[in-house]
């Protein structure tokens, strides 16, 4: 049990490393991490709980060459495989080149629930970074995965591709269920930008009760890329149910996105099942 009232970490601590770097654990295999945080939501998915003391408030990879080159960097765990993380809140400053997340950098067949992130700095200045997520940089599931009760307070204002408020990239070889996830931060990047997920790949991904309150900005964009309040782009079919976007979506001039939408920006193949969803914000494209 990770209790921030007992486990007190110096906020000035600095962690430096190349791959699989985490504020608490670098690589976690077949393990469980449990804290004391529980996010509370209103009936309309507004966060009503107070921001608690974080498990890790330090600094990860703020110096060269780590900030430009590191992969699988997480505020709690860098790389997690066949593991479970729950009830964790962190507030790091974090940098990396790819698969960077506020809780986990790269999550393989891992379940995550009741977690929150409010970073001081999130990858600021690394505009070539890919797969950046407020909670998880990239999630890859070859067996059934569930993610629930997740909240991101952090702005992510730089990045190249697969940038999302909760997940940068979601790859599903089997069924994935995402339930009650909320983004409050501004998400601004170049390609495949989403309030909840940057881009999905896989035919059995279901999103329920998601809400985005942050501004979503597409900076440049290219064909086969999208910008969306919930998901930027989907490589295959996706189901989005009872979800809402409250954040304005803005696209810079001369951008070449295939699409921008209040819920979903672009679907490449297989179609999308969008039911009982609502966009309550402006789209400037």
Q: Predicted regions span which residues?
A:
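Predominantly extracellular beta-rich ligand-binding scaffolds that present long acidic/polar faces
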Residues: 1-285
């Amino acid at each position: 049990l990770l209790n921030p009232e007992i486990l007190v970490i110096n906020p000035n601590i600095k962690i430096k490393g190349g791959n699989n770097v985490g504020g608490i654990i670098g690589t976690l295999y077949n393990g469980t991490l449990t804290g004391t945080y529980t996010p509370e939501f209103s009936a309309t998915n507004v966060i009503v709980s107070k921001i608690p003391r974080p498990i890790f408030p330090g600094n990860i990879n703020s110096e060269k060459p780590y900030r430009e080159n590191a992969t699988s960097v997480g505020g709690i765990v860098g790389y997690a495989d066949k593991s479970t993380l729950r009830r964790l809140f962190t507030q790091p400053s974090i940098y990396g080149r790819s698969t960077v997340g506020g809780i986990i950098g790269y999550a393989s067949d891992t379940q995550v629930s009741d977690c929150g992130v409010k970073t001081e700095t999130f990858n600021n200045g690394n505009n070539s970074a890919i797969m950046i997520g407020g909670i998880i940089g990239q999630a890859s599931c070859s067996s059934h995965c569930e993610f629930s009760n997740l909240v991101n307070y952090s702005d992510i204002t730089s990045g190249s591709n697969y940038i999302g408020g909760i997940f940068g990239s979601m790859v599903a070889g089997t069924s994935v269920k995402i339930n009650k996830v909320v983004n409050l931060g501004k998400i601004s990047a170049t390609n495949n930008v989403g309030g909840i997920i940057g881009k999905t790949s896989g035919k059995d991904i279901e999103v329920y009760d998601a809400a985005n309150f942050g501004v979503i900005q597409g900076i440049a964009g290219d064909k086969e890329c999208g910008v969306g309040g919930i998901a930027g782009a989907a490589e295959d079919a996706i189901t989005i149910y009872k979800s809402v976007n409250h954040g304005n979506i803005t696209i810079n001039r001369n951008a070449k996105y295939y699409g921008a939408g209040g819920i979903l920006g672009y679907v490449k193949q297989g179609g999308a099942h969008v039911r009982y969803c609502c966009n309550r914000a402006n789209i400037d494209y």
